[in-house]
Amino acid sequence: MAQRLTSAFLNWREHITPASKTSDFENTGMISPEEFVLAGDYLVSKFPTWSWECGDRIRGFLPKDKQYLVTRHVFCVQRNINIGVNEEWVDIETDDTRNKDDDQDDDAISSIHSDTSDIASAERLKGQSKELSDSGPLPLKDEEDDDQMVSPVIKEDEGRYYDLYIVYDKYYRTPRLFLRGWNAGGQLLTMKDIYEDVSGEHAGKTVTMEPFPHYHSHNTMASVHPCKHASVLLKLIKQHRERNDPIRVDQYMVLFLKFVSTMLPYFEIDYTIQA
């Protein structure tokens, strides 16, 4: 019950927060609704699998035809692991805890820049999903394996597919990710299933079931709480600037996807672009 009340309060707080009209993403890691649209347009132009949608609940601070971004049928390799988390609810950040764990921001940065085993595994499997539905199980070979060891076979019923949604959060002034998944048989995934596809650092910490703000009904989805988004993205923006490779505000969404991919290492999320 406490988790439900906390979630309801946070959603109410976001609802009553006025939309920002200022621009200061280089110093805050946050963006305005206008910059959200600008960055979304850039994402759609560079990655045609993403598109704008309006839903059936229009939020007045965004253009009617550009309410949120969506990409569908994103392949995810199913992991056979156990995560000790509640079936429906996990911990989320509140104002009392938001400022006490900057070390987690550094961990997120390290996750983005390091070649973790999760991401390495996902990269070896990337590109295979498009053939699954046509050819069935595929044997995969590890290109870096000099000992010619055979990697596990991905069976058709082991793959999962997700629709990913990016909305604008008025309170945190950042994008927010929602996701809904199905197994290969078309059955909707439970929260426990979804936790299996989230990195161990994030599963059971910042992922909750939340109402999707652009649907009136049947709108509950898994969502990554955005309380840390701005601080992590700001550090990435500063790192690019220090390397004389500054990030423009229209490229912000690509950087956001790079950050998101560390939480979802088994998802085929493409953010590699010479922007």
UniProtKB/Swiss-Prot annotation:
Active-site feature positions: C227 (glycyl thioester intermediate)
Biological process annotations from GO: autophagosome assembly; autophagy of mitochondrion; glycophagy; macroautophagy; nucleophagy; protein transport
Subcellular location: Cytoplasm; Nucleus
Keywords noted in UniProt: Autophagy, Cytoplasm, Nucleus, Protein transport, Transport, Ubl conjugation pathway
Description of the deletion phenotype: Impairs atg8-processing.
Region called Handle region, residue ranges: 231-251
GO molecular function terms noted in the UniProt entry: Atg8-family conjugating enzyme activity
Record region (Flexible region): 83-156
Region (Disordered): 123-149
Protein family membership: Belongs to the ATG3 family.
PANTHER family noted in UniProt: UBIQUITIN-LIKE-CONJUGATING ENZYME ATG3 (PTHR12866:SF2)
Protein name (database record): Autophagy-related protein 3
Lineage: Eukaryota, Fungi, Dikarya, Ascomycota, Taphrinomycotina
Gene: atg3
